[in-house]
Amino acid sequence: MTYEEGPGDAYFAVDPAHRGLLPEMVDHALTHLRHDGKVRLMVSDWDRDLQRIVHSRGLRATDGRDGNSVLDLTEPLEYAAPDGYRVISLADDGDAHGFNRLLWRGFGHPGDAPETPEQLEWRRLSMTGGPGQVPELNIAVVAPDGEYAAYCGVWHDPRTDYALVEPVCTDPDHRLRGCGRAAVLEALRRCAARGATTAYVGSNQLFYYAMGFAPYETGTWWV
């Protein structure tokens, strides 16, 4: 059981051999993961046992959903970068300023990206310094003017046969040109070369379906 950005949201992962822990995990989330007195639980729509447990604790399903999609990496992963754009890895060019600007703009923040020493150091760590980070797998698409246009981060442990796509963004000035597609598929090509046969992304956006991802599993927020 964990949360992503802070207490208030709870996600569950349990080994099939230890599903008897689920009631205790739910109770722990309800007691210890609240924020301002509130907590919501992400429950897989396929997990009837967990649904029954959270329902018995007085929670009810909402219309808030969380989709996931899957891609077969044994199939060809074809893309073409837009004319004048280059596809690189963060091992080739670790421009923290450009990376910071892209993620700021790509995820819809207004104005200029903050460039305090603390912000840039955090970006540097998120580019190459995190546990499990493989800079050669994390792909940026560079525009003709040298600015980062799109980015795809992926996570792959060579002891496993799957990859996780996260995060992905494109600068608003470079959308609808194939930059995001190029970043994602190049990153996944590299994962496939390391032995990954499947890729997952926590999204059900048409952007992913257009490159071959298919709906895999959905979850619902319970409160």
State where each predicted segment sits.
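A structural microfeature
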Residues: M1-T2, T62-R65, A150, G180, ...
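A conserved beta-strand-loop-helix scaffold within acyl/acetyltransferase catalytic domains
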Residues: T2-P7, P110-C169
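Acyl-donor-binding surface of acyltransferase catalytic domains
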Residues: E5-Y85, S89-A91, W221-V223
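Conserved acetyl-CoA-binding loop-helix of GNAT-fold acetyltransferases
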Residues: R19-T31, T170-P172, L176-A193, A210
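Conserved hydrophobic beta-strand within the GNAT/NAT acetyltransferase core sheet
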Residues: V39-M42, V165, T198-S203
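Conserved active-site tyrosine of GNAT-family acetyltransferases
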Residues: R52-H55, Y208-Y209, F213
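Short amphipathic alpha-helix that is part of the acyltransferase structural core
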Residues: A80-P117, D145
